[in-house]
Structure formats: C-alpha cells, structure tokens
Amino acid sequence: MDNYDLIIGSRFQNKNPFIKDGMPFMRYITNKLMSLMTNFLCGIKLTEFHTGYQIFSKNFCEKVPYKQNSNGYLFGFETILQAAFFNLKYGEISISSSYKGYRQSCGYFEGFIYILGNFKIIMLFFLAKFNFYKHKLFK
C-alpha cells in the first residue's frame, strides 16, 4: 500500500461480514446497495464506501480541503469522493469488525439522513467534476 494517499479499511473485501462478523442484515444490505450505487454513478471501484477506517497521507492532507467536511458519519464518504475528484491514489485493505456488545451506530432516522447526505455529496461531486459549481469540499 505504498504511495497511496488514502487507504480505506473494507469489511467487504474477501468476505461477507453479515455471515462472518455478525453485521446486522439491514446494515449489510443498505451498505452493499449504497456502495454499488456509488461505484456505478461515480466510477470509483471500491468494495465499501461507508467506513470510518481510513489512513491519510501527507499529500492527501495538503491537497484535500478535508477541514470543510462534515463532522459525523459522512466524513469518510466525503474523503473518498474527494480523493477521486482530486485524482489521488486510493486503495483498500481488508478489515474485520465486531458487532457484539456495545457499539456506536446510527438509528433508522439517522441512517435515512445519512443516505440523503450521500446523495447530496454525489450531486456536489458531479457538479464540481463537470465545472457547474465547485462546493467547498471540491475546491
């Protein structure tokens, strides 16, 4: 993973976390569908977009206006689209996650708001990519 600007920890690379790690079924389905949609719409080939497990290079931190990103769950999604927009090198590594015991996650309403936020970021990505409007995330 040398010379990557963004490394993403993916629960979906080389395995099914619904079976292996006990990921809740609705989270699994939603995550897979949203990731497939983002792959299709944005042309970014990753197995997962909805992870907080990320490593940033110095180059990423210097070129990407990540301080303009949201302060919640959308941060990770925004950084992936920013890396693609700024033509930075990104890749994935396989990780595992435990869904037993205490864990922090969003509820159904927060999840719905998160999905709407994803669509908003995708729209801003396209507007910037085609030079219609450059939101602060893509300047």
Residue positions per predicted region:
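DNA-recognition element of transcription regulators
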Residues: 77
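Catalytic donor-sugar/metal-binding loop of nucleotide-sugar-dependent glycosyltransferases
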Residues: 44-45, 67-71, 80-98
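Terminal low-complexity segments of carbohydrate-biosynthetic enzymes
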Residues: 59-60, 116-139
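Acceptor/aglycone-binding surface of glycosyltransferases and processive sugar-polymer synthases
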Residues: 1-73, 100-109, 113-119
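Short, hydrophobic secondary-structure boundary micro-motifs
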Residues: 48-49, 92, 134-135
